[in-house]
């Protein structure tokens, strides 16, 4: 029996909740002038929307030129290879967010990523306010997500659109 969009969304959100307690290490694919680029990023989600902090460089330049991206979130499978592989691919449009251009969305991303919490754990102090204006965040709004789960028997793939 085929699953409805709401059921697939719940499966995806459960996967993200289960494996994203702290953050997700993801692979972000961007492209410009037929030159693909894949960059590891640490992201967090608000529903199906993903946020991450982005250092200046190739990924931001590619997003400025072509906001169509693909983000892969996966769980390393270890020695069992495909016996318990789980992950998803998310196709969507990326937006670069700065405090200066969109303070409300920036603060939402800041809270979603939990930069204060990360700063307390890493440096034993809150995130410095003076640094906020220097940060760029990326927000990805998906239009398609493919979730894959293999238990070693019959793999399943669910597509959310």
Residue ranges and their predicted role:
Residues 23-56, 71-75, 89:
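Short beta-strand segments
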Residues 58-61, 153-155:
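Short, surface-exposed beta-strand-loop junctions and turns on beta-sheet-rich folds
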Residues 33, 58, 78, 142-146:
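Short acidic/polar capping segments at secondary-structure boundaries
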Residues 53-57, 70-77, 114-127:
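Short acidic (Asp/Glu) patches
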Residues 21-27, 118-122:
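Short Pro/Gly-enriched beta-strand edge/turn motifs at strand-loop
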């Amino acid at each position: 029996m085929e699953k409805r969009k709401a059921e697939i969304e719940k499966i995806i959100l459960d996967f993200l909740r289960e494996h994203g307690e702290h953050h997700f290490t993801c692979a972000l694919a961007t492209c410009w002038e037929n030159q693909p680029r894949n960059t590891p990023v640490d992201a967090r989600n608000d529903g199906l929307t993903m946020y991450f902090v982005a250092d200046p460089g190739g990924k931001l330049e590619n997003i400025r030129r072509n906001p169509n991206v693909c983000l892969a979130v996966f769980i390393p499978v270890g020695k069992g290879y495909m016996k318990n592989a789980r992950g998803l691919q998310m196709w969507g449009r990326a937006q670069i967010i700065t405090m200066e251009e969109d303070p409300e969305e920036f603060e939402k991303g800041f809270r979603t990523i939990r930069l204060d919490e990360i700063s307390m754990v890493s440096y034993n102090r809150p995130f410095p306010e003076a640094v906020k204006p220097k940060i760029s965040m990326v927000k990805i709004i998906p239009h398609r997500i493919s979730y894959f789960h293999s238990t070693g028997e019959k793999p399943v793939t669910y597509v959310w659109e």
